């Protein structure tokens, strides 16, 4: 009898660890929440391709929805996830730390919008992240620092707006910097890598409007200051602004 009970217990534990399938009530509830933001699933996904693991909705290599009601302080996005979908974590007040796997290439628009207690975002040393989309971390009021992987080439509009960042280092391979990137964010120290060559630098991507703040801006070697500062002559004559240029170094070879 004890062996039979042990067998049933093991079977129950195994079944509870398996992902819920598309017809499950758990997935139905998550889809109801998902469809509040969207009319359809992305990239031709069907409901039969959806899974639910520990209350989080996935489809193929996408993380589609992390419910607002989930109360974990830390969440490790599973290995193999390549895209955190738009609005995936929006409005979760419990989350304090997120670990992004090396496999993740895109953090979608509004993905962490209004995660008011999110204070840490961890990336791996071999991160393949390419895109941080529009408003991705907007209104994350506890996120005082973040260092993006150097693989990131696009940061979307207002991705770091209305949050308490004071320092930011642009990724080495940055190509696109969205408009109003730091709108409403008190960034006072910006750093570009010596040989960063962004092709697009958004309008009003940061401001130097606080006369009581001390600003420090480090530009790429031999940069056209007007491209990075707008009216460079005006900015550089302000007493509370220090503009530096990276030291001349050898151009890194393409990998």
Which residue ranges define each predicted feature?
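Sec-dependent signal peptide recognition
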Residues: 2-10
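Hydrophobic core
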Residues: 12-13, 17
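Boundary at the C-terminal end of the N-terminal hydrophobic targeting segment
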Residues: 20-22
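Structural signature of tandem-repeat unit edges
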Residues: 24-56, 67-83, 92-106, 116-131, ...
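Short, aliphatic-rich beta-strand segments
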Residues: 61-67
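Consensus positions within tandem repeat domains that build extended binding/scaffold surfaces
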Residues: 65, 85-88, 108-111, 133-136, ...
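A structural signal for leucine-rich repeat
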Residues: 182, 203-209, 232
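Active-site or metal-binding loop neighborhoods of secreted/extracellular toxin and effector enzymes
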Residues: 233-242
């Amino acid at each position: 009898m004890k062996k039979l009970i042990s067998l049933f217990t093991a079977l129950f534990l195994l079944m509870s660890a398996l992902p819920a399938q598309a017809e499950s009530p758990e997935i139905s509830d998550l889809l109801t929440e998902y469809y509040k933001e969207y009319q359809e699933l992305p990239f031709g996904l069907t409901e039969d391709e959806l899974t639910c693991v520990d209350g989080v909705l996935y489809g193929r290599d996408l993380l589609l929805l992390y419910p607002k009601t989930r109360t974990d302080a830390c969440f490790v996005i599973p290995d193999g996830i390549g895209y955190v979908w738009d609005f995936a974590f929006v409005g979760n007040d419990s989350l304090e730390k997120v670990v992004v796997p090396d496999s993740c290439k895109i953090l979608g628009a509004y993905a962490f919008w209004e995660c008011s207690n999110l204070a840490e975002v961890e990336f791996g040393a071999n991160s393949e992240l390419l895109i941080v989309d529009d408003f991705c971390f907007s209104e994350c009021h506890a996120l005082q620092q973040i260092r993006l992987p150097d693989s990131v080439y696009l940061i979307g509009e207002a991705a770091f707006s209305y949050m308490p960042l004071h320092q930011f280092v642009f990724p080495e391979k940055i190509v696109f910097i969205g408009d109003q990137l730091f709108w409403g964010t008190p960034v006072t120290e910006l750093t570009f890598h010596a040989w960063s060559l962004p092709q697009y630098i958004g309008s009003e991507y940061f401001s130097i409007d606080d006369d009581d703040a001390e600003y420090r801006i480090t530009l790429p070697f031999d940069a056209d200051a007007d491209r990075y500062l707008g009216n460079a002559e005006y900015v550089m004559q302000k007493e509370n602004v220090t503009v530096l240029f990276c030291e001349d170094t050898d151009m890194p070879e393409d990998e």
